A protein has these predicted regions:
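Active-site rim beta-loop-alpha module in soluble metabolic enzymes
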Residues: 136-195
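A C-terminal functional module that forms or caps the active site or interfaces directly
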Residues: 187-220
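His/Asp/Glu-rich mid-to-C-terminal helical/loop segments that flank catalytic regions of hydrolases
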Residues: 227-249
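Flexible, glycine/charged-enriched surface loops at secondary-structure junctions
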Residues: 48-53, 156-164, 222, 243-249
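A generic structural signal for tightly packed, nonpolar segments enriched in small/aliphatic residues
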Residues: 139-140, 154, 207, 247-249
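Metabolite-binding pocket within alpha/beta catalytic cores that recognizes anionic/polar moieties
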Residues: 1-148
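Expand to "…catalyze enediolate/carbanion chemistry for C-C bond making/breaking, isomerization
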Residues: 90, 182, 214, 222, ...
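Glycine-rich phosphate/pyrophosphate-binding loops
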Residues: 99, 215-227
Length: 249
């Protein structure tokens, strides 16, 4: 039996950061980092309505296959992602797909034909999730969500790999480690991720997987290499439809 966090509300009784209430949020949620990306993803929903926009969290709710589906931006990094997750779970959400962008890491990921990655697990190279549970606990995706993403990808014939993401706290620690006094440690660890077949580097998935596991929710992630593309958004929406249909069975 999973335990929810205590609700913290604003003066309207809404969740403190996302400024939403239970009736605003669907069971199924798409999670981009960027608030502007929510507008693009919301166009894939039927009857999408803007519910709230507070700080980095912009939230739309509409339907897919007749079920209520929400799009909510997490902002950049694990702290704001964990906050969004907790508050969406307070509102009754239990199924999450991150729709993000990422960088390439291991040699295999540098195959230019690959559009992106369906994430199966995340390296907890960040500071948020140790506030939840010791580092030995794995950050893994829900197998039903991975399978729904894999089915969507197979049906469309798009070229996505499956693999592990590194969730880090410093974008410039990845892109310019030599400018950091801590460069030795950054290089050593990056080499370890390259040698251990890490397929993607990004900043939110570890928090998504850890908070979801601990709170008893299901989560997965699909990420585009470089900038966001239509295929990644399409597959995330298709996977939500697969889960909706399978949940009815
Ligand atoms: O495209 P999003 O979802 O923001 O994800 C990636 O892009 C940002 C860095 O540019 C980080 O948030 C990283 O995880
Ligand atoms: O290289 C990249 C691209 C997106 N997001 C990251 O964190 N790194």
């Amino acid at each position: 039996m999973s335990v929810q966090s205590k609700e913290v509300t604003n003066d309207k009784g809404q969740q403190y950061h996302i400024c939403c209430s239970k009736e605003d949020i669907g069971r199924y949620v798409l999670l981009p980092g960027d608030p502007f990306r929510t507008d693009i993803i919301a166009r894939h929903l039927e009857n999408a309505k803007l519910v709230a926009h507070n700080r980095e969290h912009k939230t739309w709710t509409g339907t897919l296959n007749g079920e209520k589906v929400t799009v909510c931006s997490t902002g950049m990094g694990c702290p704001s992602t964990a906050i969004a997750l907790e508050e969406l779970i307070h509102c009754g959400a239990d199924t999450f797909i991150r729709v993000g962008t990422c960088g390439r890491v291991c040699p295999e990921s540098y195959n230019e034909d690959l559009e992106g990655v369906i994430i199966t697990g995340a390296v907890r190279d960040e500071g948020t999730t140790v506030h939840y549970v010791p580092i030995e606990y794995p950050a893994i995706a829900d197998r039903h969500v991975i399978d729904a993403l894999a089915k969507a990808c197979n049906d469309k014939g798009y070229n996505f790999a499956e693999g592990i993401a590194q969730s880090k706290d410093s974008f410039y620690g990845q892109h310019d480690p030599d400018s950091m006094p801590n460069s030795g440690r950054l290089h050593q660890r990056w080499e370890a991720w390259e040698k251990s077949r890490v397929m993607a580097s990004e900043m939110e998935t570890a928090a998504l997987f850890i908070v979801s596991s601990i709170r008893g929710a299901r989560a997965g992630a699909i990420m585009a290499y470089g900038s966001m593309n239509d295929h990644t958004i399409e597959l995330a929406c298709d996977a939500i439809k697969v889960l909706i249909e399978r949940d009815k069975e």
